[in-house]
Amino acid sequence: MDRKLIARKIAEESIVLLKNDSHLLPFSEGKMVAFFGRTQIGTLYSGNGSGGANVVGCGTILEECEKRGLMAEPLLKGFYQYKAETEPVTEQDEFDWTKVSEMVNSGIMYEIFGKYRPPLEEYEVLDTLIYQAAEKTDTAVLVIGRNSGGEECDRHLTEDYYLTETEEKLVKEVCTHFANVAVVLNVNGLIDLSWIGKYPGIKGLIFLGIPGEEGAAALAEILTGQVSPSGKMAVTVAEHYEDYPSAKYFSWDKE
């Protein structure tokens, strides 16, 4: 069997549908959707460190959804494409020198020769773009991305496990102006999900994780009903971080 078909099959059977109120999903062919979140176009396919992979040529979430008949709201699509082209991810973006002491304290050679990977900063979307998109459709897909988590020194509570201020603002704006919102978690590890229940407009929730080279294609097939999601979570998602038994003891700092 072709390796891409194998990769897609694995991804299709791994993606988890956590919420689908009012039968929001699947979307019908030709439906216009407002796509939000930088990882819709800067999709995360693999982890980092020993879990890293060459992902050149892999389709993005936006590209694969369009291939399967969804219409991306054009103004938002243009905005995210422009930001990706003019603000590409650099080595500097993936290294935070303020965390060097944490890397040393973590005591692993990977952190010395590797790098701390903070979550990439979410793009701030102009209010006018959101308003104009909401006039064309009542449906939005919001992709939350986390590239951190390759090593324990990567994970932090503030602006990592919890949403960043920019993400919180984006979630609020999207849920204010769109009646039907599906959130996709393109994350290399769990994040706080307590905010999901605060917004009635969030009717769909999908755990994509880090799905491999064909993950975006698999997600698109699930969003459009070509594949029925069958994945199950391998971990328990606590309502509050403090509910995890290891919360008091887990840290990047081994000292």
Regions found by a protein language model. Give the residues of each.
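An anion/phosphate-binding loop that grips the pyrophosphate of nucleotide cofactors and donors
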Residues: 137
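Surface-exposed amphipathic alpha-helices with a cationic face
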Residues: 171-178
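Structural alpha-helical scaffold elements that stabilize or flank donor/cofactor-binding regions
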Residues: 132-133, 198
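Alpha-helical scaffolding within the catalytic cores
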Residues: 125-128, 168, 186-193
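Short, flexible loop segments at the rims of nucleotide/cofactor-binding pockets, characterized by
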Residues: 115-122, 158-161
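Glycine/threonine-rich flexible loop motifs
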Residues: 44-47, 144-164
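Secreted, periplasmic, or luminal enzymes acting at the cell surface/secretory milieu
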Residues: 1-49, 54-71, 76-116, 186-255
